[in-house]
Amino acid sequence: MVRYKATISYDGTLFSGFQRQRHLRTVQEEIEKTLYKLNNGTKIIIHGAGRTDAGVHAYGQVIHFDLPQEQEVEKLRFALDTQTPEDIDVVNIEKVADDFHCRYQKHLKTYEFLVDNGRPKNPMMRHYTTHYPYTLNIKLMQDAINGLVGTHDFTGFTAAGTSVQNKVRTITKATVSRDEKTDFLVFTFSGNGFLYKQVRNMVGTLLKIGNGQMPVEQVKVILSSKNRQLAGPTISGNGLYLKEICYEN
């Protein structure tokens, strides 16, 4: 068997997330169906570096899969790209070592979250940004977001019911700025891993701070108390993008 690593992008609007689910359309299912056709009915299982939720998009999701025979990578990329649905793009494919695993290999993930703060909202972007029509103080959010950088237990920012035991993660970059062209707010987070709905919960909290409903110090309070009830709401995922995954070595 030969192992391949692929970088893919997708519009998450019509997907029920990345991971295969019974009777639901997912990114994993569509790619596996295409690989099945390309390999004469051989079942191929793909593995993803991140499991994006319904409606969440990706510019740089990484997957890996094993094929029975070695193939020329550009021909494989082109075939997979042209035969998957229009809302999936296969950006790059490369042959990797047999022990490479896109999820467990040490890596850095970057997520981006777009917020339309306009009144009225931009209806053309309703699937690609999350609308927040209330007044926001970006300076307050910038002060608060700095408290997320570093190694912390992010229990207070994860969704209830997660099966993950170790909730310590390291965030190396956390910024918020306003895009001058679109006027959207752009939240960017880079780190060695993120918990279930962590990014959406962090953005929901920062918006509350920007609106004056929570103090700037609330981020540190949530981290120290590990209390999800003290954080903001889980904001809708249509503004969330898995932007990039960088592997060591």
From Swiss-Prot:
UniProt record similarity statement: Belongs to the tRNA pseudouridine synthase TruA family.
Organism whose genome encodes this protein: Streptococcus pyogenes serotype M3 (strain ATCC BAA-595 / MGAS315)
Active site, renumbered: D53 (nucleophile)
Lineage: Bacteria, Bacillati, Bacillota, Bacilli, Lactobacillales
Name of the protein in its database record: tRNA pseudouridine synthase A
SUPFAM superfamilies given in the database record: Pseudouridine synthase
GO molecular function, one term: RNA binding
Claim: DNA damage is one of the keywords in the record: no
Function: Formation of pseudouridine at positions 38, 39 and 40 in the anticodon stem and loop of transfer RNAs.
Coiled coil spans: none
HAMAP family: TruA
GO biological process: tRNA pseudouridine synthesis
